[in-house]
């Protein structure tokens, strides 16, 4: 059964984008014309719908808690643990609206998907190139400075260890929040690896829990507090896994 779900996943994944290709082109024309409101409306309508479809097709049940912890008076930086390829559609479906993501450069090479991600405000990072990584962080910082919230996975890659753990949270991504004085909103994702990777990269039904935790203010942080921030956020997330 899992093989059929996996096939259905990829058929839906790209089928939706092909069927809605005219919407993509409309959004790109609006962006080129400087009509950011039309872009925002189209992205807000279609990205969550696409993401929820990915979950529905593969029998994923999503439980979300803590949406009231998302700041309403300005942008924030969501910091989530990274366990699965599913993490991106889980957050795009589960948060109050879709946000840009600091994503690996490989996603920027996938036809159609890369164009939607650019409209969403995603930034692609080349992890093995220091200068390119700095440019990506600067681009993400500019997005938050413009008033839009942003999502980062500070581990830099999927954590493949035991359930309930995370990799090291790298400090670089936290500079986005510190430079913009935006609050950090920790997000704990549990159960995601069991949807795909734990079963030999085959789509498997299951329940995932996304917990949005209280924001951590970065404005006025001392150097010592900034240095401790990555591990403090990691420990906050670990306590919820």
Where are these regions (language model features)?
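Non-catalytic C-terminal accessory region of glycerolipid acyltransferases
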Residues: 3-4, 134-241
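A hydrophobic membrane-anchoring feature enriched in long, contiguous, low-charge segments
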Residues: 3-29
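Structural motif marking the loop-to-transmembrane transition
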Residues: 3-11, 39-43, 177
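Active-site phosphate/pyrophosphate- and oxyanion-stabilizing loops and adjacent acidic/basic residues
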Residues: 52, 89, 174-175
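Thr-Gly-centered strand-to-loop micro-motif
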Residues: 65, 102-104, 126-127, 154, ...
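A short, well-structured juxtamembrane/interface segment
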Residues: 49, 53-75
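Generic preference for hydrophobic
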Residues: 64, 78, 101, 152, ...
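Catalytic core of membrane glycerolipid acyltransferases/transacylases, capturing the structured
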Residues: 20-33, 40-44, 55-57, 72-130
């Amino acid at each position: 059964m899992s093989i059929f779900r996996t096939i259905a996943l990829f058929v839906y994944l790209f089928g939706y984008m092909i069927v809605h290709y005219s919407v993509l082109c409309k959004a790109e024309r609006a962006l080129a014309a400087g009509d950011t409101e039309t872009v925002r409306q189209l992205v807000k309508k279609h990205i969550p719908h696409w993401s929820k479809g990915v979950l529905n097709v593969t029998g994923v049940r999503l439980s979300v808690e803590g949406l009231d912890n998302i700041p309403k008076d300005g942008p924030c930086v969501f910091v989530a643990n990274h366990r699965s390829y599913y993490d991106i559609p889980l957050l795009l479906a589960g948060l109050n609206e879709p946000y840009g993501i600091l994503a690996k450069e490989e996603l920027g090479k996938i036809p159609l998907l890369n164009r939607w991600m650019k409209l969403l405000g995603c930034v692609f990072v080349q992890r093995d190139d220091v200068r390119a990584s700095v440019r990506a962080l600067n681009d993400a910082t500019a997005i938050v400075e413009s008033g839009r919230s942003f999502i980062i996975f500070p581990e830099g890659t999927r954590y493949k260890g035991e359930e309930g753990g995370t990799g090291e949270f790298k400090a670089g991504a936290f500079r986005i929040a510190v430079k913009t004085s935006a609050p950090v909103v920790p997000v704990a994702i549990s159960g995601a690896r069991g949807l795909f990777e734990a079963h030999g990269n085959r789509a498997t039904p299951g329940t995932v829990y996304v917990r949005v935790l209280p924001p951590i203010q970065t404005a006025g942080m001392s150097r010592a507090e900034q240095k401790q921030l990555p591990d403090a956020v990691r420990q906050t997330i670990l306590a919820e896994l």
